């Protein structure tokens, strides 16, 4: 079942939800053999996989804070480095590659990358729902590739989840953030540990719960804050408790 509330055509700034789109383009590139997850990219010793999983050691603005694979350091600069690397390897501007590899095939015609590949996309609800559907049942990627991308990359790394503090096991996939057993967290207490997605500082999120076989997309123009810290988990638990939106036994 699909339930849409609000203006589905109005574009919203996605903020860091943009990283899911950037990561998906990079994953498509690996299947096209334009990139390899284990190829060198970013600081010495780092790979494409390190950049996707916030494990390259790069800090938020590009400073090297740790050796690759030793800490989970959330880094916009890492995703910008990844996009630049993909552009160099493909010979195509990253925004064009994203459009050709992801947006056009999913009929996301109103989505635009207007700034950083880490946080600069804009999209309406209808387009993000199409992308969420792809994450539930992939057509652009092999099932095995998406399964790898939504499994823990570089397990055991601690780090800070923006807005929610330090996590002893700050698990991340190859782009998506993984719910696992993080606490506190922006997902609902009833969401499966295998749930994955991303939220953005513009008050946006995209979450996929594979156990419930559902996805939830929220787009707002209210900056992330305490309203989201308390409200999003309650909202997601309410969705899971709704027998129409999340039928028992799915």
Task: Give residue ranges: language-model regions.
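Catalytic loop of the DD-peptidase/beta-lactamase superfamily, centered on the K-T-G motif
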Residues: 1-13, 18, 70-71, 87-92, ...
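Active-site-proximal loop and beta-strand segments within enzyme catalytic domains
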Residues: 2, 6-96
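Short, hydrophobic secondary-structure boundary micro-motifs
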Residues: 37-39, 60-64, 111-114, 143-144, ...
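Short acidic/histidine-centered micro-motifs embedded in hydrophobic/aromatic stretches
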Residues: 44, 54, 100-105, 148-152
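Secretory-pathway/luminal and periplasmic proteins that interact with or process carbohydrate-rich
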Residues: 57-61, 106-113, 154-161
């Amino acid at each position: 079942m699909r339930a849409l509330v609000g203006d589905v055509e109005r574009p919203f700034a996605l903020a860091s939800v943009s990283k899911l789109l950037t990561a998906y383009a990079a994953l498509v590139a690996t299947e096209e053999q334009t990139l390899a997850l284990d190829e060198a990219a970013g600081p010495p010793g780092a790979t494409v996989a390190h950049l996707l999983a916030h494990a390259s050691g790069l800090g938020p603005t590009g400073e090297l804070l740790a050796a690759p694979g030793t800490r989970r350091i959330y880094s916009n600069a890492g995703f910008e480095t990844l996009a630049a690397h993909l552009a160099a390897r493909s010979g195509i501007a990253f925004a064009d590659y994203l459009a050709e590899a992801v947006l056009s095939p999913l009929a996301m015609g109103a989505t635009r990358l207007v700034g950083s590949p880490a946080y600069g996309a804009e999209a309406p609800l209808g387009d993000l729902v199409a992308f969420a559907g792809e994450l539930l049942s992939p057509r652009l990627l092999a099932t095995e590739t998406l399964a790898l991308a939504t499994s823990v990359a570089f397990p055991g790394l601690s780090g800070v989840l923006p807005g929610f503090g330090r996590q002893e096991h700050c698990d991340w996939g190859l782009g998506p953030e993984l719910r696992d057993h993080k606490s506190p967290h922006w997902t609902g207490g009833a969401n499966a540990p295998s749930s994955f997605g991303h939220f953005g500082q513009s008050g946006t999120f995209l979450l996929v719960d594979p156990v419930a076989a559902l996805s939830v997309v929220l787009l707002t123009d209210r900056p992330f804050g305490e309203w989201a810290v308390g409200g999003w988990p309650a909202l997601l638990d309410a969705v899971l408790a709704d027998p129409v939106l999340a039928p028992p036994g799915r």
